[in-house]
Amino acid sequence: MEAKAIARHVRVTPRKARRMVDLIRGKKATEAITILKFAPQDASLPVRKVLESAIANARVKADKAGEPFRENDLVVKETYVDEGVTLKRFRARAQGRAARINKRTSHITVVVANKEGNR
C-alpha cells in the first residue's frame, strides 16, 4: 500500500530541499525521520513534516482498508522536489539602481509504501 503527501509553496529553495530529499530516498520511514530530525539544515524541517504527513496518510489508508498498520514496515519509496513560484523582490543599490532578489519556493512530494509493495 502506498501513501503520498505533498507540500506546496514551501519557502525553501528547491536546490536545498533536494539535498535533504536525497538523504532519505529508499530508507525506512522511521530512520528517515531520525535523519531529518538531527540534520542541521533548515530545509530538513519542511521535508520531515511532509514525511510525517505521508506516514499519517498511510495509517488512515490502512485503517479504512481494515489492514494492520506497522510504521516500521514503511519505506520512503519515492520523493522529489519541484520548483514552485518565485517571488521577485528588489533591493536598493548604489546610485539609484536596484538588484533583483529571487525568493524561491518548492513543492515537496513524499511517497511511502510497505516493504512488500516496494519490491
Swiss-Prot record:
Protein name from the UniProt record: Large ribosomal subunit protein uL22
GO terms classed as biological process: translation
Classification via CDD domains: Ribosomal_L22
UniProt similarity note: Belongs to the universal ribosomal protein uL22 family.
Highest taxon listed in the record's lineage: Bacteria
Keywords: Ribonucleoprotein, Ribosomal protein, RNA-binding, rRNA-binding
PANTHER family associated with the record: CHLOROPLAST 50S RIBOSOMAL PROTEIN L22-RELATED, LARGE RIBOSOMAL SUBUNIT PROTEIN UL22M
Organism: Bifidobacterium adolescentis (strain ATCC 15703 / DSM 20083 / NCTC 11814 / E194a)
GO molecular function: rRNA binding; structural constituent of ribosome
Gene: rplV
